Amino acid sequence: VTGNRHNIIAHKIIYHNMHSSKNTPAKSALSALDRRFFLKTSAFAAAGLTFCRLPVMAGPFTREDFDQIVPADKKLSPEWVKSLFARGERTVYRGKELEKIGMPVGGICAGQIYLGGDGKLWHWDIFNQPRRTDGSTYQNPLVPASPLEQGFAIEVTVDGEKQVRPLTQAGFSDISFCGEYPLANIEYRDPKVPVTVSLEAFSPFVPLNTDDSGLPATVLRYTVRNTSSAKVEVRLAGWLENAVCHFSAPGDAAKRRNSVKRGQGVLLIQSDVENGPAEQVLKPELMSEADLRQPLDMGTMAIALLEPQTSDRAAASVGAGNLPEAAFAAAPADQAAQTAGRKLVGAIVRTMTLDAGKEATATFLVTWHFPYLDMQKWKIERMENLKDNGRYYATKFPSAAAVAGYMAAHFATLHAQTRLWHDTWYDSTLPYWFLDRTMLNTGCLASATSHRFATGRFWGWEGVGCCEGTCTHVWHYAHAMARLFPDLERDLRKRTDFGTAIEKPSGAIRHRGEGFGLAVDGQAGCILRAYREHQMTAGGLWLKELWPNIKLAMQCLIKMDRGDGMLDGHQHNTLDAGWYGQIAWLSGLYLACLRAAAEMATDMKDDAFAAECRKIADTGRESIKKLFDQEYFINLVDPKYPNAVNSGTGCEIDQVFGQSWAYQVGLERVIPQKETRLALQALWRYNFTPDCGAYRKIYKGGRFFALAGEAGMLMCTFPRKDWSFENASGKGNMDGVCNLFNEVMNGFEYQVAGHMIWEGMVQQGLAVTRAVHDRHHPSKRNPWNEVECGDHYSRS
């Protein structure tokens, strides 16, 4: 609870019987909670009303509401429920809400660069430096910071009086931020400044055009409007420090160099290091040992101004003066060099003369080109067999200047198509908050979670620098990339899952590509994704090439079936352990991929295998009913493995995941409807809580991705008397992966929320999604970074 001032729920807890002589001994684990804990929670909840603009979600609650830790009656506020469905207004943040914002504004698979709430670029993870994250940023969000000097400022002159204002919170008293990925709009106002400034920031994002969506570039498009009654002279400056080899520190013997370049429709300053590598398009086959001996941060970067005018000025160096004033004062110069131990900052200035009420726009670019991505530098043993290296964008462009030149030549189209996607997405009757939340996590592709090697191979961490290998049992929860950039998913199926990763003759798919063995949920997910990619591909040639290995992978799972349409034996899964017995959610995924395999077999004229898969799936649809225990699906635990983790008769979040997947690809039902809906209702009753604090007060193990006072759906609870967290932990595993049961994780919640909506439980599905959304309010943490085991976690 400590430090969590901005509660999403902001409910009041009533203690009308805390000291009554009529109180009986507590009937549940919650009896361990003392009055002080409730008072703390109540106090912080009240603070939520003061410090946070979020509506009250639920309550008031009594102590008795929490007798089962997760209250059965969620007591959702009618106003809050109404807000779930209302179209509402565009989400705009101001004041202190701006401080934690970091929206990805680089190309997909091109590094990670954030746009801050006041328009400053930060984070700058473009230099190929190994950086691990572990989930801790949920509780301790990153503080905006930059390893280099970069920014924008405006100089306004009226009747000879001049003022210089940085385009940050330091320069303007009223700044508003509206982030609708991939576009962000920032407004700058100040009563002492006779102009307003509007910033539109983005990187080209064009679904179905992966290359143009993967440009290593950020667009910053400033529109200045004269709000006074007099003519104003305006100068707009942008500057960029030469940070090439910033981390490898070549010493004073090396010189950084800035060069002004003029091209068709562009004025730019390119930064490099003297005697660096020749500018050339990188060929994958030429990623030699000599190339990999280059410093990882060797390359080029540039700041550019599109459609330059004769009055525009570029200075390769602003000298030693203070920024931003030095950017305006610097004399034009086409070349500058500086020893590596000293800063070298270049600036470009646009001049405008604006009559009263008039406006003008200047479009700046920041581009980069650091080709020497080398995954071996991570020193992870399981990546020893990973041979792919280099940046894909370097196979298209020889330098940052070339990237800027390409964007200058095609800017009208890139801008229009990015806006078209944005406008199409938001041209909806769906709530703004819902459109924001279900699109913004696609920014994971523009984070350091996602990479595209020089060979064209897509490769991802689970979260930034955490758990390698485009893990099958994590990435199969995500669908955005497949729908927006299906060529990347097709390549991932062909090159990795059914290529590098599949073992012959078993058909097992190593769940981390080059490493680790079979994960049954990931295996099923690969087969289902193959069917999805087939649906997203014209003709049947793609499937025809992969079908033998897809069939082999399906047969691998069939061998784990003892004839009843259910999986048995050792079943490693995304909860990082091998489970034994008949597991509802794993067998449900098995049934879904059987249906998908049958459809693919039919398309491949493999009628015998199609019939076999359908017969097994029909059998399994009946067999899985035996795991339905009155309210929800449980597992039949194999008693021969008492040491194994198993949720047993617990209410586990993914129990009907197979049916959720079936909806995604239009398959017939794999789990009966009545039981499926009852299971989802049980998840709402037993796992969704308006305040996770009460549960975590009892079950302390595990990471915190929902704090006291925050709503969420718990991974697994134990409503039955015959099974508990201790049973589920197995013998000797109390401090191990069983702690995952106590956690709240976004990617799992999205899966359930989507499934609820499929099944007609729209209010509950929206409530679960809104809980994720509200946990990521910028008064608390960065809305654009959904954290699990690492930043920008791919499951989301």
Where in this protein do the model-derived segments appear?
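Short, solvent-exposed loop/turn and secondary-structure capping segments
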Residues: 103, 113-117, 123-127, 137, ...
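Short amphipathic alpha-helical coiled-coil/interface segments
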Residues: 407, 411, 418, 613-624, ...
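N-terminal secretory signal peptides and thylakoid transit peptides that target proteins
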Residues: 24-46
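Mature N-terminal segment immediately following signal peptide/propeptide cleavage
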Residues: 84-117
